Amino acid sequence: MKNEIAAVVFFFTRLVRKHDKLKKEAVERFAEKLTQILQEKYKNHWYPEKPSKGQAYRCIRVNKFQRVDPDVLKACEDSCILYSDLGLPKELTLWVDPCEVCCRYGKKNNAFIVASFENEDENKDEISKKVSRALDKVTSDYHSGSSSSDEDTSKEVEVKPSAVATTPSPVYQISELIFPPLPMWHPLPRKKPGMYRGGGHQSHYPPPVPFAYPSPGRKNKAFRPIPVTWVPPPGMHCDRNHWINPHMLAPH
């Protein structure tokens, strides 16, 4: 396990030095903290007899869904450096398995072997040479491809105004949906006071209310006159010889 972790640490160290944002002491401090974190994490999830077991748990991943790897971030915090100063690409995946460390650098690039080990007797110089050769190859062959993939990623995230439908959707008021507007009814024209004079004197009774006035939302029914009873004014007696004013009829 120590060789595989050493390969991962060498890989990150070379990337950080290429970015040239941190001093040598800060890079060494980061490498030491990352080594301790990975050893503590992998010690109970390392299966030489079945290397693929626990592969997802040991994976170090940076992409648009996980922009910061938690183990690398913890190493930065423990070594008092900023994560952004590492200069990591936007798409990076490292598979740390027994006897082999693989990497995919960039979004559309193929995975490659960073280092493979047949035994545990290899020294750090040999591991460093393997990692350096692999990293030099990937940065020279895939650097332009990873940059274009990062640009494609930013373009995918950006929302283009032309892709959005510009046709306005109909807007309805809540009152229109719940309470439909009632039809307009024209009021009866007002009559002058002189029109209700009968028998030489002004009537004290209002004009008759039109019966069977249509109501909104209902079908018109057949006209049925409402029975009325004539109520004589106080002090006036009714007999058959008197003329009855129709405006003096009042609903019963």
Curated annotation (Swiss-Prot):
Which SUPFAM superfamilies does its entry note? BTG domain-like (SSF160696)
Similarity section: Belongs to the BTG family.
User: By what name is this protein known?
Assistant: Protein BTG3
InterPro entries per record: Anti_prolifrtn, BTG, BTG-like_sf
A single Gene Ontology CC annotation of this entry is: cytoplasm
GO-annotated biological processes: negative regulation of cell population proliferation; negative regulation of mitotic cell cycle; response to oxidative stress
Organism (species): Rattus norvegicus (Rat)
Q: Which Pfam families match?
A: BTG
Transmembrane spans: none
What domain of life is recorded for the organism?
Eukaryota
The record's tissue-specificity note reads: Highly expressed in the brain.
Question: Region Disordered: what ranges?
Answer: 138-162
Described purpose of this protein according to its UniProt entry: Overexpression impairs serum-induced cell cycle progression from the G0/G1 to S phase.
UniProt induction comment:
By 12-O-tetradecanoylphorbol-13-acetate (TPA). Induced at higher levels by TPA and cycloheximide together. Also induced by redox changes after stimulation by hydrogen peroxide or menadione.
